[in-house]
């Protein structure tokens, strides 16, 4: 997986001295799926050797839409950690931490909220889309302001790069504006981040109607068994105009072919040609896709099993990552308070 840097500044991403830092993460509202993998997670795995990588489990932001389902939160936090480790995130190279355990993030969020307009948040396209998806007629304070919290997540770690799906670009743009505003108002102590969008910014779901989503029941999860993958691919939407096996197909409108293009690139051209000529049927095409997906997921299943059998190790990984993240956040907040002249006990007073 590669990806491209979406330069919101209109220029190239400037490398700075020392190891650059990445901040990325997910809300723990359920298991991660193939859309997460190609949209962001594969880039995190690839870049963790090159960058100082921080991965946030955004449990506070999960409450913006799941506040009434908090009994699942702890299970989901550990579940998403398993997804990271199974996908190849190395805790020796990447710092995995829990958002709610870093109080400095919430302090910085409050400072940012003092100069961030409510109208800017209301007109954020991702906020509007998610509000409609969840049926929010009257947005809560926490939901409306979560992009400000995201800006604090990113900037408190001085992240240069943020691997995201394309629907998160408005949030990165807002984070850049907030950081720029802070640096102009006080002192330039924070870093303006860039968005790194995956090779497949938005993967269509199994139903072919919308992007893959855990809430829409159209996802292949990284934690799915081989039998579950087989079943889901058998039921995936294909070319609706193709009735018989020998009918010429239209791969450009077929969800299964889109997955071949993404996950089976080496055979995609052959499959496209065979589909158009009617020499391969949908059943055989789906079997080849399921085989390819299971081949890709099998190493993840092996890593998952290793960590599932040692829950104490998973807890220690989270605790150590959170300790490290807390230390970095404290250092940044010392600079922030100094810049804002609210470090009241760090200098002499004159009455």
Where are these regions (language model features)?
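N-terminal Rossmann-like or analogous alpha/beta NTP/dinucleotide-binding catalytic cores
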Residues: 16-152, 305
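Conserved nucleotide- and phosphate/pyrophosphate-binding catalytic cores
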Residues: 36, 170, 176-351
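Short helix-capping/linker segments at secondary-structure and domain boundaries
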Residues: 118-122, 156-163, 264-272, 301
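Short, Lys/Arg-enriched N-terminal segments with co-localized hydrophobic residues
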Residues: 2-14
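Internal, conserved structured core segments that host functional sites
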Residues: 126-129, 133-178, 182, 204
């Amino acid at each position: 997986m590669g990806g491209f840097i979406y330069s919101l500044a209109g220029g190239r991403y400037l490398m700075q001295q020392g190891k650059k830092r990445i901040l990325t993460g997910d809300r723990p509202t359920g298991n991660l799926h193939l859309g997460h993998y190609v949209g962001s997670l594969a880039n995190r795995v690839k870049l963790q050797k090159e960058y100082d990588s921080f991965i946030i489990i955004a449990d506070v932001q999960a409450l913006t839409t799941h506040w009434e389902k908090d009994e699942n939160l702890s299970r989901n936090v550990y579940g998403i950690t398993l997804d990271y480790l199974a996908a190849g995130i190395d805790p020796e190279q990447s710092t995995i931490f829990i958002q709610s355990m870093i109080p400095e993030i919430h302090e910085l969020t409050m400072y940012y909220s003092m100069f961030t307009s409510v109208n800017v948040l209301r007109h954020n396209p991702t906020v509007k889309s998610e509000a409609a998806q969840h049926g929010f007629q009257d947005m809560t304070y926490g939901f409306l302001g979560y992009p400000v919290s995201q800006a604090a997540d990113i900037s408190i770690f001085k992240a240069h790069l943020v691997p995201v799906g394309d629907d998160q670009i408005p949030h990165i743009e807002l984070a850049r504006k907030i950081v720029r505003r802070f640096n102009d108002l006080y002192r330039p102590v924070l870093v303006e981040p860039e968005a790194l969008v995956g090779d497949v910014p938005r993967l269509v779901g199994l139903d072919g109607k919308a992007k893959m989503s855990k809430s829409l029941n159209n996802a292949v999860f990284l934690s799915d068994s081989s039998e579950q993958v087989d079943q889901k691919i058998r039921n995936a939407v294909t070319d609706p105009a193709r009735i018989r096996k020998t009918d010429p197909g239209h791969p450009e409108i077929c969800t299964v072919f889109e997955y071949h293009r993404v996950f089976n690139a080496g055979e995609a051209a052959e499959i496209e040609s065979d589909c158009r000529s009617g020499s391969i049927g949908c059943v055989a095409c789906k079997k080849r896709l399921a085989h390819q997906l299971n081949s890709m997921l099998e190493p993840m299943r092996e890593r998952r099993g290793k960590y599932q059998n040692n829950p104490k190790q998973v807890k220690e990984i989270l605790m150590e990552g959170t300790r490290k993240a807390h230390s970095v956040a404290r250092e940044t907040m010392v600079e922030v308070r100094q810049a804002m002249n609210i470090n009241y006990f760090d200098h002499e007073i004159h009455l």
